[in-house]
């Protein structure tokens, strides 16, 4: 088996800082060598965490042939989403729904299939057992007590771990593919939506309303919206980027759960990003996001 043939993917909640509060560590591990290709900690297991692990993997190793996660809804859509396939998707040959993460790995040409049980992902389960012992000690010794500091520390820790614990693959050839230059990772590794603006340049995401500041776009223009921790919100139309401003920000409790864009994890991700980039200095009239 070659390095890069299959990466096991998972996340694990744990009391990493020995404070009684659990945080989720996301990771990919190479099945052939046991190398960690990426680690990233978030408050909860979520899309953002897996996107950052994918970013680390692409930047440091390249594109793997396949990814082997569990059936978590970040990776595979629930049945109610599978039942709502647009006509355009059907014409393009799609038979099932797809998640935001699934769309990204599909664009990269990565095959993704679900593990049937934790035992089927034995290598990454053993990794968690090791890290839950070693990382807690490392964090204590280095006085690390926050997610931000932990993620900074993990960059060098991965290198040390791999140097100590990785093993040679049965086949010495790596099958990681070099990331083509045409990819803009900041744009690729995003939550992505398509919307149509109204006569005032207004669009909405899960009932939160935004307006394009530039008034030159005609009504009914289709726009692409990109959301990530790296870039905040980026809006594009006709290959041009437009600045936006928030008009009405809606709390998690008021999100339309019947929307086809809605998943619990996706709603949380959108709220977290909007909160980070639009509510830090928001006016008091804006509704606070839960």
Spans of features found by a protein language model:
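Basic, flexible linker segments flanking DNA-binding modules
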Residues: 1-9, 14-15, 83-96, 174-181, ...
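Mobile-element integrase/transposase regions
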Residues: 1-36, 43-65, 102-107, 201
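Charged alpha-helix within mobile-element recombinases
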Residues: 94, 100-170, 175-187
């Amino acid at each position: 088996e070659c390095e890069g043939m299959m990466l096991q993917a998972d996340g694990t909640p744990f009391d990493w800082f020995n404070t009684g509060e659990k945080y989720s560590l996301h990771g990919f591990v190479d099945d052939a060598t046991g190398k960690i290709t990426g680690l990233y900690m978030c408050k909860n297991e979520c899309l953002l965490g897996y996107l950052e692990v994918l970013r680390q993997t692409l930047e440091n190793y390249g594109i793997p042939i396949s990814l082997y996660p569990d059936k978590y809804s970040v990776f595979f859509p629930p049945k109610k989403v599978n039942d709502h396939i647009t006509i355009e998707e059907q014409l393009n040959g799609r038979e099932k729904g797809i998640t935001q993460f699934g769309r990204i790995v599909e664009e990269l040409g990565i095959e993704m299939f679900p593990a049937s049980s934790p035992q089927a992902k034995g290598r990454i389960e053993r990794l968690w057992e090791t890290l839950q012992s070693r990382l807690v000690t490392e964090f204590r010794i280095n006085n690390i007590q926050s997610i931000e500091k932990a993620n900074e520390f993990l960059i060098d820790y991965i290198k040390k771990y791999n140097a100590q614990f990785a093993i040679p693959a049965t086949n010495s050839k790596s099958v990681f593919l070099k990331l083509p230059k045409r990819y803009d990772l900041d744009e690729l590794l995003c939550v992505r939506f398509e919307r149509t603006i109204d006569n005032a340049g207004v669009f909405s995401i899960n009932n939160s309303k935004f307006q394009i500041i530039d008034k030159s776009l005609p009504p009914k223009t289709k726009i692409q919206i990109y959301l990530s921790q790296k870039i905040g919100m980026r809006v594009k139309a006709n290959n041009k980027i437009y600045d936006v401003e928030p008009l009405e920000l809606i709390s998690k409790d008021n999100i339309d759960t019947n929307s086809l864009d809605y998943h619990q994890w996706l709603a949380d991700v959108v709220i977290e990003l909007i909160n980070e980039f639009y509510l830090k200095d928001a006016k008091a009239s804006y509704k606070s996001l839960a």
